[in-house]
């Protein structure tokens, strides 16, 4: 989960998120260099004694400041497209879970496991125990195995919602009447948090998502059924 | 930064981090510190060298800034390429170790197949 006043990305829990962090570092370095150049140009503009305002016919400069941004955009676009197509790769998921957004909770269906269905409500502050996270913890977590490709089918029963888990690099809109699909493979066990990411009414901020990722051996023993 | 495990707590990580222009975290971004340092060195060498030859201050500053950008970019791509290669090698090594642990002693053990074919 994010710590207080965190600005940067959370640590990665899936290979796609690792790639996204690498791309983010790459884009940020290019942005830093562009900002540095612009700040220097601004400094020169503010400290020059030259005041000629009718400069014209600077073909070389115009060529440079057209070609250079095009090259920069290509340098950014190529890795971006690579990751975009990587997220759409079909990787033969081990099983499928359906996530349905409601106002203001999530319903999860484990149809591969005998039709287990449960709701996941945020824990109200009065029901929090010491160590629980305010506005993040839920009554029933989504329990999943580590290192197994999982397919999430996401939809909504009423208005638009969005199922997001930042550490996995996931954000998929829950649209009524439409079934969106996303797949992921978690690389390490733990409890990971996300929040609804599409404005959906008064309690939009109070319908979090909690994934509990456990080793496959323990998952197969069936703890997810003990509700 | 990248990687699931960091030895420092988030608060400690924040105290140690230096953010250039307020957003580029050079401590926690792989290759950033290395690139910026070499870029600064390149900028100083290029700018000062140009000044020694031409005695033009303004143009030397421009050469210094240009040198910083080019050297930083060059070091950055070189370092990131090697970093990506290293990550791929680590992943291959991890997979091979996992396979070895799983298949050692079984009929699927690649070493047993190799030894069997060489003895024949």
From Swiss-Prot, chain A:
Q: Which domain of life is it from?
A: Eukaryota
Q: Which segments sit on the Mitochondrial intermembrane face?
A: 1-14, 88-227
Q: Which UniProt keywords apply?
A: Copper, Electron transport, Magnesium, Membrane, Metal-binding, Mitochondrion, Mitochondrion inner membrane, Respiratory chain, Translocase, Transmembrane, Transmembrane helix, Transport
**Keyword Lyase on entry:** no
Single GO biological process annotation from the record? ATP synthesis coupled electron transport
Query: So where does Cu cation A1 get bound?
Result: 161, 196, 200, 207
Instruction: Please name the Gene3D superfamilies in this protein's record.
Output: 1.10.287.90, Cupredoxins - blue copper proteins
**UniProt: Cu cation A2 binding residues:** 196, 198, 200, 204
Q: Which cofactor does it need?
A: Cu cation
Cofactor details (free text): Binds a dinuclear copper A center per subunit.
Q: Which CDD domains did the record assign?
A: CcO_II_C (cd13912)
EC code: 7.1.1.9
Membrane association type: Multi-pass membrane protein
Binding-site positions, Mg(2+): 198
> Which residues does the entry place in the Mitochondrial matrix compartment?
46-59
* Localization annotation: Mitochondrion inner membrane
Q: Name one Pfam family in it.
A: COX2
Assembly description: Component of the cytochrome c oxidase (complex IV, CIV), a multisubunit enzyme composed of 14 subunits. The complex is composed of a catalytic core of 3 subunits MT-CO1, MT-CO2 and MT-CO3, encoded in the mitochondrial DNA, and 11 supernumerary subunits COX4I, COX5A, COX5B, COX6A, COX6B, COX6C, COX7A, COX7B, COX7C, COX8 and NDUFA4, which are encoded in the nuclear genome.
According to its UniProt record, which protein family does this protein belong to? Belongs to the cytochrome c oxidase subunit 2 family.
Name of the protein described by the UniProt record: Cytochrome c oxidase subunit 2
Could you tell me which species this protein originates from? Pan troglodytes
What gene is behind this protein? MT-CO2
